[in-house]
């Protein structure tokens, strides 16, 4: 239904640009809870269960492993940009595990390419986002996967596969290998725009977190908040953002391109 709507909208693009509105050149999407329909808490619980099942039989302590993952993630979120997120994670992980991350990285990549796929069971429904993303790209726009870069590329690729997509379907994907900041730091978004040579005022951001995703509006980005799996622990008034379920927001986005 979205694609049929898009075909009609594409024929009227010029009429939908609006008076003083900047022409949109770039669309950014969050991943978890936005393109992928799942509850973040259920995802994390399943992720920790499966990664523990991978590494505990190899002789690693479960509690230490989970603490290393949590603390490593927390330190990436606080990254000040001096090094890439991967380096922050490596340092924290090595300190707690008393073993260099590089020595375990092969096992981590194997996990993200294989066992991690079982976390797909947390999806609330089977969806295929390929047609939707293609419709946007066919308009000549840049499409960015602006997922919080606390995971390696391999983990993002596996999650994208669940919804019929690949990292190759995007012009840019934020990963812990290529990013120096995390959400909700505005520097995270500034780094994206610098790397893809786009302007915030010519961009749209679609996400489900009222703080982490919507904060980019402070740079002049037009934002859309997905409410299907809304994340809003800060109790931000979401009425100040354009919001709705995924299908509603998808059609709104297509309507202004």
Q: What positions do the PLM features span?
A:
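Asp-based, Mg2+/Mn2+-dependent phosphohydrolase catalytic module
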Residues: 2-27, 134, 148-150, 156-257
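Active-site neighborhood of HAD-like aspartate-dependent phosphohydrolases
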Residues: 12, 16-68
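Short histidine/acidic/glycine/proline-rich micro-motifs that form metal-
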Residues: 35-37, 75-76, 147-151, 178-179
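Residues at alpha-helix caps and immediate loop-helix transition turns in enzyme cores, especially N-
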Residues: 40-43, 47, 125, 155-156, ...
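Short acidic alpha-helix initiation/capping motifs at coil-to-helix transition points
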Residues: 41-48, 81-92, 150-151
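A metal-dependent, Asp-based hydrolase signature
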Residues: 70-113
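Short, acidic loop-to-helix structural element flanking the phosphoryl-transfer center
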Residues: 105-106, 114-144
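Short, flexible loop segments at the rims of nucleotide/cofactor-binding pockets, characterized by
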Residues: 119-123, 152, 180
């Amino acid at each position: 239904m979205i694609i049929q709507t898009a075909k009609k909208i594409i024929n009227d693009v010029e009429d939908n640009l609006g008076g003083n509105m900047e022409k949109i050149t770039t669309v950014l999407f969050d991943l978890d809870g936005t393109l992928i329909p799942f509850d973040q808490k259920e995802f994390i619980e399943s992720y920790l269960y499966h990664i523990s099942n991978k590494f505990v039989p190899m002789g690693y302590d479960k509690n230490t492993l989970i603490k290393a993952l949590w603390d490593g993630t927390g330190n990436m979120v606080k990254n000040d940009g001096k090094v890439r997120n991967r380096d922050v994670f490596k340092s924290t992980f090595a300190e707690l595990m008393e073993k260099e991350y590089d020595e375990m990285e092969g096992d981590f990549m194997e996990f993200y390419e294989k066992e991690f796929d079982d976390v797909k069971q947390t999806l609330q429904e089977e969806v295929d986002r390929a047609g939707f993303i293609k419709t946007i790209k066919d308009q000549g726009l840049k499409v960015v996967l602006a997922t919080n870069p606390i995971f390696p590329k391999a983990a993002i690729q596996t999650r994208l596969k669940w919804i019929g997509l690949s990292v190759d379907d995007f012009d840019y994907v934020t990963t812990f290998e290529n990013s120096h900041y995390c959400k909700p730091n505005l520097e995270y978004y500034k780094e994206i725009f610098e790397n893809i040579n786009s302007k915030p005022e010519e961009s749209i951001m679609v996400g489900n977190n009222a703080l982490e995703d919507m904060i980019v509006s402070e740079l002049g980005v037009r934002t859309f908040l997905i409410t299907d799996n809304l994340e809003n622990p800060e109790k931000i008034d979401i009425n100040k953002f354009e919001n709705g379920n995924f299908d509603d927001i998808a059609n709104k986005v297509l309507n202004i391109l």
